[in-house]
Amino acid sequence: MKANELREKSAQQLNEQLLGLLRDQFNLRMQKATGQLGQSHLLSQVKRDIARVKTVLNQQAGK
């Protein structure tokens, strides 16, 4: 996901996406804890996506 794509979305859409990403992160952490996570790069990828969404939300709030 690109930051430019996120900037085109509304705050409500971004909040919904953020909740989905947080759920994904939780599920991936549980899979890692139980040894079922085969693609460990997904954890850091989701973490970065969360940071991107939060950054865009803060930028929109500052305007």
From Swiss-Prot:
What residues form the membrane-spanning segments?
A: none
InterPro entries assigned: Ribosomal_protein_uL29 (IPR050063), Ribosomal_uL29 (IPR001854), Ribosomal_uL29_CS (IPR018254), Ribosomal_uL29_sf (IPR036049)
Give a GO molecular function annotation for the protein: structural constituent of ribosome
Provide the GO biological process annotations: translation
Q: Which domain of life is it from?
A: Bacteria
**What keywords would UniProt list here?**
Ribonucleoprotein, Ribosomal protein
Q: Name one GO cellular component term.
A: cytosolic large ribosomal subunit
Q: Which family does it belong to?
A: Belongs to the universal ribosomal protein uL29 family.
- Name of the featured protein: Large ribosomal subunit protein uL29
Source species, please?
Answer: Pseudomonas syringae pv. tomato (strain ATCC BAA-871 / DC3000)
Which gene is this protein's source? rpmC
